[in-house]
Amino acid sequence: MSLSTVLSLSTQFAWLIPIYGFAGMVVSLPWATGWIQRNAPRTPAYLNLIISLVAFLHGSLALQDVLQNGAHIIRFPWLNLSQADLQLNISLDISPTNLAALELITGLSFIAQLYALGYLDKEWALARFFALAGFFEGAMSGVVLSDSLFQSYFLLEMLTLSTYLLVGFWYAQPLVVTAARDAFLTKRVGDVMLLMGVVALSAFAGGMEFEDLYTWADKNTLTPLATTLLGLALIAGPIGKCAQFPMHLWLDEAMEGPNPASILRNSVVVTCGAIVLMKLMPILHHSQITIAVLLAIGTISALGGSLVSIAQVDIKRTLSYSTTAYLGLVFIAIALEQPALALLTLFAHAIAKALLSMSIGSVIAVSNCQDITELGGLGSRMPATTSAYLIAGAGLTGLLPLGCFWCFGLGMDLIGRQAPWFASIYLITNTLTALNLTRVFRQVFLGAPMPKTRRAAEVNWQMALPMVVLLVAVALTPWMMARIDPLPGIGAFSAITGITVATSGLVGLTIGAIVPLNKAWSRSLNQPVRWVQDLLAFDFYTDRFYRLTIVNIVSGCSYIASWFDTAIVNGFVNYVGRFSMDSAEGLRLSISGRSQSYILTVVITIVFLLAALSWLVS
C-alpha cells in the first residue's frame, strides 16, 4: 500500500478520531466500576495511552493529506424532518485548521495522561480517572471537527459533564463536592442560553450545519432586536467554556480536581469554546451590540484576570486567572475579525500553559502544598521542574524568540490598525503576566528552603519525561506556528512592534524581580492599599456580588414560590379535605338511625331541588 493511499484512507476515516477517546473510556469501565478489582490495575492507563497515541498519529496522517489535497466534509445523514423543514446531519469538517487543533488536543491529552501515570501513582481510582480522561478527549476532538452547531452543542454539554466528574474526582472531600457543583452550575448558565440560540436557529435556518447557517445569516430578515438577542444567546456558551467574565468562577473552582485534569482545562478545554465562537462569527457580526459585548468581555477578562492573578497565593489559581486573561485576548481578536491571530494565540498559549501546569503540579506533588508563601528553595532541588517553569514562562510572556512573542507582535500590528486602544491591552496583559510568573518563580524556586521543601526531590521519570517533551515543544512553537500559519507570516510586523512587545515582557519581569515579597505580600497598613489588595485577592468580590444579587433573588423567588405552594395550593386542597371530614363528622352526629328520618330527609331534599329548578326555569 502506497503512502498516498494511506494518507487518503486516514482522511476518509478521520471521523474515527473522536471515537478513539470514547473507546478508551469504554475499555476502562470494567476497572473503573470495580468489575475487575485485582488484576492489573494500571491496564486501563496503558490502554488509554495507546489509544491517545493512535489518535494523534491518525490525525497527523490526515493533516498531511489535507495539506496536500485540500479540505473536505464528511457527512452522515441522521434526521430529516421535511414537514418542519429541518435536516440534521452528523457532519465533520476535515480542514487543516481543524486537524491542527485536533493534533494539539490529542497530543496534549497523551502527554497529560502520561504525566498522570506518575502523578496519580498511588491513587486507588486510577482507572476512573483514565476513563474520564478518555471521555474528555473524545468530546474535545468532536468539538474541533464538528461542522454542525447542534452537534457542537451536544459535545459542549459532554465537556460540561466531564468537567463536573473530573473536578469532583476526590468526592470524599466536601470542598471538592462543592467546587464540582459550582463549576457545573456556572457552565450550565451559558449552556442553557446557548441552547436557546440553537433552538431559535433551528427554526430560522432549516439546517444546523455551519454553511447553512452562514447562508441564512447573509439573508437574515430578523429585526435588529431579535438579531441581538440571538447573538447574545449564542456567545453565552463560549463565554462560559472559556471562563470569561462574568462566568469565569468555574475555572477557579475546577482547581480542586487532580492536576493532570487541570493541565487539559487550562490549555485545550478553553480552546474548544473559542473554536466554537470562531465558527459562529459570520452569524454574530450581523449584530454590532453582540460584537461590542464580546469586546467588553474580552477586555474585562484580560485586564481583570491579569490583575487578580498577581494577588493570589494558591499556585494553581495564579495560572487559572492567567488563562482567563489570555482567552480574553482571543475574544478581542475574534471580535475584531482576526480569527487567524486568535488561532495562533490559542496554539502558543495552550502548549506553554500545559508545561506551566505540569511544573507547578510537580511542585505540589513533592511538597503537598499549594500555598506559595510556604514554598521556597526548590530551584536547586528540582532542576527539571525549574527549567520547565522558566521555558514555559518565557513562552507565555512574549519574550523573543518563543511563541507568544510572535502572537503579541501580530496582535499589536493587526489590531493596532483597527483599534489602537485594544492593542494596548495586549501589552498590559503581557506585562502583568510576566510580573505574576516572576513573582511565583521567586517565591517557589528561589530563596531558602522552607519546612515543606527541605527534603524535596525531583519527580519520577513519568512526570519528568512529559515536561521535557513539552519543553522542546515550547521551544519549537514558532517553527510549528510557521508551518500551520494562516497569516502571511508570523514575523510580518515591524521591528518597533517587536521591540515594544519584548519591552513589555521585560518590564513585567523587572517589576516582579525587584518588588519585595518577604515570603508573602503582607497586607498594607495603608487603608486604600489594603482595600486594593483585598479587591484583587478576592476576585473583585465577584462571588459575593453574585451571592448578594442573583443568589438572593433566586432564593427569594424560591421562598415565595414555596410559600405559595404550601399556603395557597396545598392549603386549599387541605381545606377541602378538612371541610369534607368535618362535614361528615357533623352529619354522623346528626343521624338518629331511624328509617323514617332518612326517608323524610330525602323527600325534603327532592322537594327543595325541584323548587329551585322550577324557579330557575321560570
Curated annotation (Swiss-Prot):
One of its GO terms (biological process) is electron transport coupled proton transport. Pfam families: Proton_antipo_M (PF00361), Proton_antipo_N (PF00662). The chain crosses the membrane at residues 16-36, 43-63, 99-119, 129-149, 152-172, 190-210, 220-240, 267-287, 291-311, 318-335, 348-368, 390-410, 419-438, 461-481, 495-515, 553-573, 597-617. InterPro entries: ND/Mrp_TM, NU5C-like, NU5C2, Proton_antipo_N. GO terms for molecular function: NADH dehydrogenase (ubiquinone) activity; quinone binding. It comes from the Eukaryota. Keywords: Membrane, NAD, NADP, Organellar chromatophore, Plastid, Plastoquinone, Quinone, Thylakoid, Translocase, Transmembrane, Transmembrane helix, Transport. One of its GO terms (cellular component) is plastid. It catalyses: a plastoquinone + NADH + (n+1) H(+)(in) = a plastoquinol + NAD(+) + n H(+)(out); a plastoquinone + NADPH + (n+1) H(+)(in) = a plastoquinol + NADP(+) + n H(+)(out). Its EC number is 7.1.1.-. NDH shuttles electrons from NAD(P)H:plastoquinone, via FMN and iron-sulfur (Fe-S) centers, to quinones in the photosynthetic chain and possibly in a chloroplast respiratory chain. The immediate electron acceptor for the enzyme in this species is believed to be plastoquinone. Couples the redox reaction to proton translocation, and thus conserves the redox energy in a proton gradient. Belongs to the complex I subunit 5 family. NDH is composed of at least 16 different subunits, 5 of which are encoded in the nucleus. PANTHER family: NADH-UBIQUINONE OXIDOREDUCTASE CHAIN 5 (PTHR42829:SF2). This is NAD(P)H-quinone oxidoreductase subunit 5, organellar chromatophore 2. It comes from Paulinella chromatophora. The lineage of its organism: Eukaryota, Sar, Rhizaria, Cercozoa, Imbricatea. The gene is ndhF2.
